[in-house]
Design a protein with these regions (language model features):
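Short catalytic micro-motifs in class I SAM-dependent methyltransferases
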Residues: 388-392
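A conserved beta-strand element that flanks and buttresses the S-adenosyl-L-methionine
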Residues: 385
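Conserved donor-nucleotide/metal-binding helix-loop-beta segment in metal-dependent transferases, i.e.
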Residues: 104-135
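A glycosyltransferase accessory/donor-loop signature
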Residues: 2-4, 151-156, 173-282
Length: 467
């Protein structure tokens, strides 16, 4: 029986940066494809999640919750979601891992008469381990045997990949109690999972135990609702007549924060990844992107503008422009400090939105001052630096707000980079944005007596502006 009524979606955000980055794009994709109601997306944060990231989801309009850790405190935290949703009005809830992204509406696939989950990709754990667990749990009757999604082995019906579960309201209370009960039991009886290297599958195996021990109705979901791309394999549960609705990418991201799979995949998979990347690109946000970049890809850090030849070029340019002679310097968007860390600057304040970048910067120059804030006040300096910040401002309002801040805090000279014109490469890059020629923006402020181009690299120009 197809689902009707109100569907809500829920996922857990933990303290690690990846939860916020993936969760941000997952939440946006659910809002875009699954009804347009931000309040139907429930973000459940563990206690350690920084307030900045809670505010990010709150600004999006999501419903926010805090949940305590459960069991091992790592892989089983999702089990506390159902209890925290107990007072919410809904007809069914979809529990998701954050490393998924919606490409289409999930709701037409859902049912009111059964819990849905997609059978495991491969035999994790093996059938023999499930048999051993079932015997120890005194399971009265084994479930039916079925094939894994890749057809690599047999497993039991209900042994599902944990990235997607759909649960009708009528079964939530029972499943919540039984799932947690069997997870605690399994954590005390881990040997079959430990022996097969499947300790991280406690959540999915305890789900399997819970639905069968409690006699809850279950139906296997099509692979359209939990489509893996992290390895090449058959998707035997795919409904070929319908689109892929939910990708489970398992952190297959590149340095640009986009999905990346090896070449040679099927046209269906390549098209799905393209749609996923369009979704991610449309949701570019400086706060989540740069935290992901500095923590996930520290070798790339601030980007090509602060590495290799460009790094040496900008460092020499700063020396020529007198940065070491300035009484004090304000660096807006200082990043990981690769360009300036070796310069003899006397009084330096670096500002950035990424706590990970500032950790690197503080380690490099503990004698300098660093501040985590997007819009600080009262930081005027004789020389202000702003390299490759304006090009990442998604909206014109954000672009002009940065310029206004730079103008307000420049006592002597501003060195700033940006675009002089639009181009196809800019239009095709979801990370960068053109609003107008930078020189036009600077002259419009009326603040500077002299504006001159003093450099250029990659596809940006650098201006010196003197008050």
């Amino acid at each position: 029986m197809s689902g009707s009524g109100r569907t809500i979606f829920s996922f857990v955000v933990d303290a690690a940066y990846s939860f916020t980055y993936h969760g941000w794009h997952l939440a946006r994709s659910l809002i875009e494809h699954c009804g347009g109601d931000p309040e139907a997306v429930h973000v459940q944060c563990t206690p350690e999640v920084d307030q900045r990231w809670r505010d990010l989801f709150r600004e999006l309009g999501c419903a926010m919750h805090q949940i305590s850790r459960f069991g091992d405190g790592r892989y089983c935290n999702k089990l506390n979601q159902l209890e925290s949703l107990g007072t919410i009005a809904f007809d069914r809830v979809v529990l998701l891992d954050t490393d998924t992204i919606a490409l289409a509406d999930l709701r037409p696939f859902l049912r009111d008469d059964a819990i849905l989950g997609k059978i495991v990709d491969v035999a994790n754990p093996p059938l023999a381990a499930l048999d051993e667990i079932a015997a120890a749990a005194a399971m009265r009757q084994r479930p039916a045997i079925c094939k894994t999604d890749t057809l690599d082995a047999d497993t039991y019906i209900g042994n599902c990949n944990g990235g997607f579960y759909s649960i009708p309201r009528a079964f939530c209370a029972c499943l919540s109690v039984e799932w947690r009960r069997w997870a605690l039991w399994l954590l005390d009886n881990m040997e079959p999972l430990r022996r097969t290297g499947c300790q991280n599958h406690v959540d999915q195996v305890s789900f399997w135990l819970a639905i069968h021990q409690a006699g809850l109705p279950f139906a296997a979901a099509p692979a359209n609702l939990n489509y893996f791309i992290h390895f090449d394999g058959k998707h035997s549960y795919l409904d070929e007549t319908r689109d892929i609705a939910l990708l489970h990418h398992h952190h297959c991201l590149n340095v640009l924060g986009l999905l990346e799979i090896p070449p040679g995949r099927s046209p269906r998979e390549e098209a799905a990844v393209l749609r996923g990347n369009q979704q991610i690109g449309g949701g570019f946000d400086n706060r989540v992107f740069w935290e992901m970049r500095y923590q996930g890809f520290p070798e790339r850090g601030s980007g090509v503008g602060s590495r290799g030849y460009n790094l040496l070029y900008k460092r020499q340019l700063l020396k020529e422009q007198g940065v070491e002679a300035a009484a004090n310097v304000l660096d807006f968007g200082c990043g990981d400090l690769e360009v300036v860390k070796e310069l003899a600057i006397r009084r330096y304040v670096g500002i950035d939105q990424s706590s990970a970048a500032l950790d690197v910067a503080r380690h490099a120059r503990p004698d300098w001052d660093f501040r985590l804030t997007p819009r600080p006040e009262g930081q005027p300096a004789e020389m202000v630096l702003c390299f490759e910040v304006l090009i990442h401002q998604k909206t014109e309002a954000a672009y002009r707000a940065v310029i206004a801040f730079l103008v307000e805090n420049t006592l002597g000279s501003l060195l700033v980079s940006g675009f002089s014109k639009n181009s196809e490469s800019i239009r095709q890059n979801p990370m960068v944005f053109f609003h107008e020629p930078l020189e036009t923006s600077l002259r419009r402020t009326g603040r500077f007596k002299r504006i001159q181009q003093v450099g250029a690299h990659t596809n940006v120009v650098i201006y010196r502006c003197d008050v």
